[in-house]
Structure formats: structure tokens, C-alpha cells
UniProtKB/Swiss-Prot annotation:
This is Yellow-related salivary protein ASP4. Female salivary gland (at protein level). Glycans are attached at N29. Residues 1-18 form the signal peptide. Belongs to the major royal jelly protein family. InterPro entries: 6-blade_b-propeller_TolB-like, Royal_jelly/protein_yellow. Keywords: Glycoprotein, Secreted, Signal. It comes from the Eukaryota. It holds the Pfam family MRJP. It is found in: Secreted.
Amino acid sequence: MKIFLCIIAVVSLQGVVAFHVEREYAWKNITYEGIDPASYNIENSIPTAFAHDAASKKIFITVPRRNQIPFTLTELDTTKHPERSPPLSKFPGSDKLISVYQPVIDECRRLWIADVGQVEYKGDEQKYPKQKAAIIAYDLTKDNYPEIDRYEIPNNVAGNSLGFGGFAVDVTNPKEGCGNTFVYITNFEDNTLIVYDQEKKDSWKISHGSFKPEHDSTLSHNGEQYKYRVGIFGIALGDRDPEGNRPAYYIAGSSTKLFEISTKILKQKGAKFDPVNLGNRGPHSEAIALAYDPKTKVIFFAEADSRQISCWNIQKPLNHKNTDVIYASSKFIFGTDISVDSESQLWFLSNGQPPIDNLKLTFDKPHIRLMRVDTAKAIRRTKCEVKRVKP
């Protein structure tokens, strides 16, 4: 998702709302296990996203390919490395990957990635020749994570793959098997949503006005203001109905509105796309990442301009009065991913590197942080907590 993936700002006043958050990891710079630091560029080692496998206690972290980056897909064994600044290990079987922005783990413990098939810089065209973007799945239940699915996205569907944003994996009925699966990938540059039908090995793209940016958004950093304008970026899936369909919640990066569409529509190639505008989260609440927690019925947003992680309970109307803040810290700079794992733990990552030209970085203090908080604790005593009425 280009360097713009670094734009999710989660910077706020230190200690304002962070009562239940535990800082899991903090790095001054990324190191790689078994690799001499002199052989790679630490300034280019910018993690953008992750996926936590609760069963194995491993975290899979993506580092988009830039000059002198050894691995674009890595893993971190949290049992083996309990320290605060552990090295990242190479993901098995990832030698041929070009550049990966985000990993997702589904209910069948498959790790899904979208390899964009090209690099964002000049000079390594022979080493990393441009190829078709591909959706790839690995089996986390087996040793060395064998590749179990690969699909090359046609160019007319993928569009500019450097604009790939968030994506979601939709297993229709996990209790009956994992075969009937769909993948939804946003493209914030082309303002499209890509749908992959794993069973039929087919894909298509959807365009809609709600995917487009509504306005220029503003990012403030060190007293300066920077403008950006992006379309559909974040997508998250809600609860299944008896037929296995779910609401798909999505946001454009330069918009404060939240939209919903049933996956029943997404799964039908050529179906009429008629989303529901759920409401407006309020001024300066732009976000490009969101995550849904089925346990609490809450959607969490990593906001940009307001520099906070906010929440909204889907059981309430969506408006500014029904949203709240669950985390804010001046040290959590430029969050790049947010997700809820299978144990209802909310995780969010910041890499401390905004997409600003000629940005000068210092490596004397940790600027890359991975945080974790229990979702129920995070919303306690906020507007997002809906207490059950005892019969």
C-alpha cells in the first residue's frame, strides 16, 4: 500500500487513555535473526502490518520491499523471544515473494497475504522483476507452513497493486470446512474492491462512489501540516447470519463515514452494489484501519488526524456522541495496523515513520511499537461498553 501505509496516526497526549494497554514490543530499529545488520538498511526496514496466531503465540510481520530489505514476510515467536526488542525471523518459503503489505489469519489457521508483485523503488528491477499481484495462503497447522493456495490476480482486476490497502478473509462456514472462502482487498488508489472466490478460482473488482475520498485530509507532524487524499482502505467483517453471510464494514481514508454491505452481495459477481451509510464518526476522525471484535460487538478505528484509537459499538447508532477513545499516547507514533485475534485481544502497531518527504529519523529511542489490550478491558467504562441486562 505504498509508503502511505505509514499514515495511520495514533499519536495523542501521553497517558490520556491507556489504562489497560500493555506495551508488548518496542524497537529502535528492526533486526533480523541470523542476518548481519551491516548487510541491510535499517532505515528501510519499516514494518507495516502483522497477524497474531493465538494458537502458536507467533506474530507474522510484513516489511514491504525497499532497498536492502532481506525479508518482506517475517515471523516472531513470542515464546522464544520474550524480550522487548526481539529480532524477526524469515518466514519459511518466502524467498520468491516480491513485496507484502499485510497478513491475515482466518478461522482455519491459514495465513493469507497479497504479494503486490512489484517494488516501490528503482534499481532492483532485475532482482525483483515486476509480476502479477498474487493472493497466497499458508497452512499454519503444519511444520514450515506449506503453501496451500496461490492465485494470480489479472491485471485488469488488480489495477495498481501498489494501492492495495487492507483486506479481509471470509470463510463462509468454518464448522463445515474451509473450502468456501472469499478474500476482499481494497485498492485506495483505484478506489476499487477486489473479490477473490477461492473455490471457483475467479476474481472481479467493484467500483462505487462510497469508495472515493470525500475531501483532503490533514496530518499534523512537528508543527507542520501535510495533506493526503485516499479512497477505500480499511475493511472488517462482522457476525455471520445462519446462511454464512456477514456485514462488511469499510472506510475510505479521506472520509469520516462508515459503510456496510452484505457479503452476500460481494460473493455474487455482477450483483447490484447498494451499501448502507451507517453514519458519520465526527470531525477529524479519518481512519484507514479498523477491526471488529465479535465478543464485545465493537469496531475499533486507528484514526489519523485526531491521533487516537477510537471505538463504536454496532448496537448503537453511529454518530460522534456514541464513539469513544480507548487509547492515546504520544509515544505511539503513526500506527499502521490494527486487528483482533481469536482470543479477543486487540493489537495495534506503529512504526514511527510518517510518509513525509526527506524525513530525518533518529534511532536512539524506540519508535516502532506493538501494543496489546483485551477488548473487554479496553472499552470498560466507555460509551462502547453495552452491559447485558440480567433476566
